[in-house]
Swiss-Prot record:
SUPFAM superfamilies: Cytochrome P450
Origin: domain of life: Eukaryota
UniProt-annotated binding residues for heme: 417
Protein's recorded name: Cytochrome P450 85A3
Listed GO CC annotations: membrane
Similarity remark: Belongs to the cytochrome P450 family.
InterPro entries named among the record's database cross-references: Cyt_P450, Cyt_P450_CS, Cyt_P450_E_grp-I, Cyt_P450_sf
EC number of the protein: 1.14.14.180, 1.14.14.179
Keyword Transmembrane: yes
Tissue-wise expression: Expressed in fruits.
Species lineage: Eukaryota, Viridiplantae, Streptophyta, Embryophyta, Tracheophyta
Predominant location category: membrane
Summary of the function given for this chain in its UniProt record: Catalyzes the C6-oxidation step in brassinosteroids biosynthesis. Converts 6-deoxocastasterone (6-deoxoCS) to castasterone (CS), and castasterone (CS) to brassinolide (BL).
Length: 467
């Protein structure tokens, strides 16, 4: 009885204390010309509802308040924009009172110098350094041959498998391919395995609350970063002691430094390498997995993509690699990739932070607030994509959708993803060898979670056989 009395007193006391706090929040956040919306609980805001309900939370708020509303998520007062025209304006006007506004956990784990965190002249400089590594000429002459060689070798290991978890396999494929491009590290090498252990913790920690306690994903992410930083510092130190220039991303980036074209500090260099690994891993692995699923579920699309890739193979001997001209000819494959990105919504949106009070859409957004350019709902807008919940790669061939202002799957403005073509090349090469090499059928584990990241909760198991 005493325990129930204590619980009642604590709960009643909390309600009494919370009431003035909620009233204070309403007064603070409604005294200015802010967009409509709710701010939720003190300190925590509406983060729990946002993470638990995901897209439904956004749909409900949109139904109540329209395409532009306020909230308090991931520790910050935030304005959410689902207006296509306004989203383009926000992404194209970063210099006018806006800077990147990604969560603190992401900044802490990927590094304060990563390209997504910096702005102004520093961003322009680092973007130039990255584009010198992954521009179309570099993809054609250096990167695509490495990707092709890796994919051939990596997928050959699947030949003796009967049933595989394609989610796990594409994660390994994306990670080790990225590591091969960055440092030329073989999949079976001990250093690759050390990178893998640290990196998996990084991937978990980036979308977590910044609570630095041993049982949290944020803590694990920080520990993973320490592991990766230590490994990279040792590699950079060893390479500086050698006169040989390695023909991988790290080597070429260090060579640019030697030629005084782009001089990055060790911290900047390390943060870019971690960011390249992270960006490529999440997008390439998940898009590859979901493309395999969608192609399985839509036989006509599978038939069409096979037709495209067998036409390429007919012009080659068995051991000939695909080249840049082959890659550019993969029109339907690119359409499959774009449609997969759209329908699965691998990327939900981008964040900006105001550096001054600014007016948007007739409302005043205070300095220090986040603006969440939420693109997910645009992916299912029937005015842009007729029959939006249907997997239809042909829509990308019939209409120039990737040039429309609503196409924000790779970001926009000065922050259009510099690795866009690299990612498409990697997924295209994987699909080339996968669809020409295997037949497959799903055998279980097809329960998908699509927020906050796309994931098959029990794996996505498929039975593979030679084509």
């Amino acid at each position: 009885m005493a325990i129930f009395l204590i619980i009642f007193v604590v709960f009643f006391g909390f309600c009494i204390l919370s009431t003035p706090l909620f009233r204070w929040i309403d007064i603070v956040y409604n005294k200015k010309n802010l967009p409509p919306g709710t701010m939720g609980w003190p300190i925590f805001g509406e983060t729990r509802e946002f993470l638990n309900q995901g897209p439904n939370f956004m749909k409900n708020q949109r139904a109540r308040y329209g395409n532009f509303f306020k909230s308090h998520i991931l520790g910050c007062p935030t304005v959410v924009s689902m207006d296509a025209g306004l989203n383009v304006y926000i992404l194209n006007n970063e210099a006018k009172g806006l800077i990147p506004g990604y969560p603190q956990s992401m900044l802490d784990i990927l590094g304060k110098c990563n390209i997504a965190a910096v702005h102004g002249a520093t961003h322009k400089y680092i973007r130039g350094a990255l584009l010198s590594l992954i521009n179309p000429t570099m993809i054609k002459d250096h990167i695509l041959p490495k990707i092709d060689k890796f994919m051939r070798s990596h997928l050959s290991g699947w030949d003796n498998c009967n049933v595989i978890d394609i989610q796990q396999m594409t994660k390994e494929m994306a990670f080790f391919s990225s590591l091969d491009q960055i440092g030329g590290f073989a999949t079976s090498s001990s250093i690759a395995q050390e990178f893998r252990a640290g990196f998996l913790n990084i991937a978990l920690g980036t979308i977590s609350l910044p609570i630095n306690f041993p049982t949290t994903n944020y803590y694990r992410g920080l520990q993973g970063r320490k592991t990766i930083v230590k490994l990279l510092r040792k590699i950079i130190e060893d390479r500086r002691g050698s006169k040989k220039i390695q023909q991988d991303m790290l080597g070429l980036m260090m060579n640019e430094e030697a030629k005084n074209r782009y001089t990055l500090s060790d911290e900047e260099l390390i943060d870019q390498i971690i960011t390249i690994m992270y960006s490529g891993f999440e997008t390439v692995s998940t898009t590859s997995m979901m493309a395999v699923k969608y192609l399985h579920d839509h036989p006509k699309a599978l038939e069409e993509i096979r037709k495209e890739h067998f036409a390429i193979r007919e012009k080659k001997s068995l051991e000939d690699p695909i080249d840049y001209n082959d890659f550019k000819a993969m029109r339907f494959t690119r359409a499959v990739i774009y449609e997969t990105l759209r329908l699965a919504t691998i990327v939900n949106g981008v964040l900006r932070k105001t550096t001054q009070d600014m007016e948007l859409n007739g409302y005043m957004i205070p300095k220090g607030w986040r603006i969440y350019v939420y693109t997910r709902e645009l992916n299912y807008d029937p005015l842009i994509y007729p029959d939006p919940y249907t997997f239809n790669p042909w829509r990308w061939l019939e209409n120039n959708l990737d040039h429309q202002s609503s196409f924000l799957m790779f970001g926009g403005g000065t922050r259009l993803c510099p690795g866009k073509e690299l990612g498409v090349a990697e997924i295209s090469t994987f699909l080339h060898y996968f669809v020409t090499r295997y037949r497959w059928e799903e055998v279980g584990g097809n329960k998908l979670m699509k927020f906050p990241r796309v994931e098959a909760l029990n794996g996505l198991w498929i039975k593979v056989s030679a084509y």
